From Swiss-Prot:
It comes from the Bacteria. PROSITE patterns: PSI_RLU. GO terms for biological process: enzyme-directed rRNA pseudouridine synthesis; tRNA processing. Belongs to the pseudouridine synthase RluA family. Responsible for synthesis of pseudouridine from uracil-65 in transfer RNAs. GO terms for molecular function: RNA binding; tRNA pseudouridine(65) synthase activity. InterPro entries: PsdUridine_synth_cat_dom_sf, PsdUridine_synth_RluA-like_CS, PsdUridine_synth_RsuA/RluA, RluA_PseudoU_synthase. It catalyses: uridine(65) in tRNA = pseudouridine(65) in tRNA. Keywords: Isomerase, tRNA processing. NCBIfam families: PRK11112.1 (NF008321). It comes from Vibrio parahaemolyticus serotype O3:K6 (strain RIMD 2210633). The active site is at residue 58. This is tRNA pseudouridine synthase C.
Length: 246
């Protein structure tokens, strides 16, 4: 497997941010022993210095991922990330049409991993989870997934106000508008349609932008990650303007 060259979207003496490819793990995990490529190790080799992750992105999600360039910076900045003193913007393609923007305040129970959390308590209280969402574009495709001859999809902008595990995926599923390509919370019929008709084999969730005040310069940092080839060909097919996600 050829080494991946990560796209660096921001770098200074304190931070480096990359556009994480969909399907790539952030760091080594004993749950995925067969994997050989990880963002942390690849980036370390690429820039020739150690990096320290400040937040996480699920394996199937693409987009902005920020690292500190020293453990001292990481320990100073981690609390800011943990307290959500930054604004994250995601884009997703979801089933159905959403007509109006809104804010979903729907608590989520801790989602335990069958293997990693085998001995964790199953009885934890649901945690507050808040997501602002806004529809940006619609499409109706001439393929059936049920009783109707066509199927509708929507391009969404989402800003999580809290950071629960799989929050955006679970919140959109709760609204009955699951994200396309979500194999754990989504709808298999729509995932299959996108695989077969649009050659889309990934979760259509992308971390487009991250904003926060630089803790050492006090300037506002805006880090952006562009969409990949799968997204671009969907925008072409659906006649959507890529400016919507810039």
């Amino acid at each position: 497997m050829a080494p991946v060259e990560l796209e660096i979207v921001y770098q200074d003496e304190y931070f480096v941010a990359v556009n994480k490819p969909a399907g790539m793990l952030v760091h080594r995990s004993w749950l995925d022993k067969h994997e050989t490529q990880f963002v942390m190790q690849t980036l370390r080799d690429q820039i020739g210095q150690h990096v320290f992750p400040l937040h996480r992105l699920d394996r199937p999600t693409s987009g902005v991922l920020v690292f500190a360039l020293s453990s001292e910076v990481a320990s100073q900045v981690m609390p800011m990330f943990a307290e959500h003193k930054m604004e994250k913007t995601y884009h997703a393609i979801v089933r159905g049409w959403i007509e109006e923007e809104g804010v979903l305040d729907y608590a989520l129970k801790v989602e335990l991993d069958k293997i990693a959390d085998k001995f964790a308590s199953q009885e934890k209280e649901a945690q507050e989870a808040v997501t602002a969402y806004k529809p940006l574009a619609k499409v109706e495709v001439p393929y059936s997934t049920g009783k109707f001859p066509t199927t509708r999809y929507c391009l969404m902008e989402m800003k999580p106000k809290t950071g629960r595990k799989h929050q955006l995926r679970r919140h959109m599923a709760h609204l009955r508008h699951p994200i396309v390509g979500d194999t754990s919370h989504g709808d298999g019929k729509h995932n299959k349609l996108f695989r077969n008709e649009f050659d889309s084999h990934r979760l259509l969730l992308h971390a487009s932008e991250l904003r926060f005040v630089h803790p050492f310069t006090n300037e506002e940092l805006v880090m952006k990650a562009s969409i990949d080839d799968t997204w671009q060909q969907l925008f072409t097919r659906f006649e959507w303007d890529e400016e919507l996600v810039k």
